[in-house]
């Protein structure tokens, strides 16, 4: 609806595969190539990005670079994009696991009014943000308006819960409609296959 002057604009849905840094690098390479052959118009046609693991990291990085280019004009060269996304994550992370988990398990960090343990997830995020040179201090809510106004494609993450294997649908947009199951098909005992992150933590900040 935000594509002005185009009667029926094309719409693109991306699904990326997992596979660690190789998948992240491949995703960035493919998106960069698609942009080049469409005269940097590919993301303007893309509505939704979803997928798994490394592919989503690569797609998220490319999307963030696209947004940064729109907002501030700052851009990385093609080679720098690929170098940043393929920078080593495992060695620093393995070192942090070996040292932090054994010796510094009780180190904390503050986030607003809350305090959390510095675990491997914290280290992973710090290393990734440093490698990519983007995302610093970004939160899910920061993408509500850019996605809503079609500046960037919507990203939908769908990790599984440990307890029962259901998918948690994570997006900056309200997507509860994806969690609905028809009770007629379930003997009037609905069992929701998906859980929306935003609805689950609606009362939390």
Model-derived regions: residue spans:
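Catalytic domains of lipid- and phosphate-ester/thioester hydrolases
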Residues: 1-205
């Amino acid at each position: 609806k935000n594509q002005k002057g185009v009667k029926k604009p094309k719409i693109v849905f991306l699904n990326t595969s997992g596979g660690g840094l190789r998948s992240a690098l491949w995703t960035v390479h493919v998106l960069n190539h698609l942009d080049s052959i469409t005269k940097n118009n590919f993301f303007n046609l893309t509505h939704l990005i979803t997928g798994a693991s490394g592919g989503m990291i690569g797609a998220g990085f490319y999307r963030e670079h696209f947004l940064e280019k729109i907002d501030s004009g700052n851009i990385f060269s093609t080679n720098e994009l690929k170098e940043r996304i393929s920078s080593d994550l495992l060695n620093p992370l393995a070192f942090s696991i070996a040292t932090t988990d054994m010796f510094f398990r009780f180190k904390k960090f503050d986030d607003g009014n809350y305090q959390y343990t510095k675990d491997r997830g914290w280290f992973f995020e710090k290393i990734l943000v440093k490698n990519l040179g983007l995302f610093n201090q970004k939160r899910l809510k920061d993408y509500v308006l850019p996605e809503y106004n079609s500046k960037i494609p919507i990203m939908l993450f769908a990790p599984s819960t440990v307890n029962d294997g259901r998918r948690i649908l994570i997006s900056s947009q309200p997507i509860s409609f994806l969690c609905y199951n028809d009770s007629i098909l379930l003997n009037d005992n609905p069992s929701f296959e998906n859980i929306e992150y935003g609805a689950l933590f609606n009362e939390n900040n």
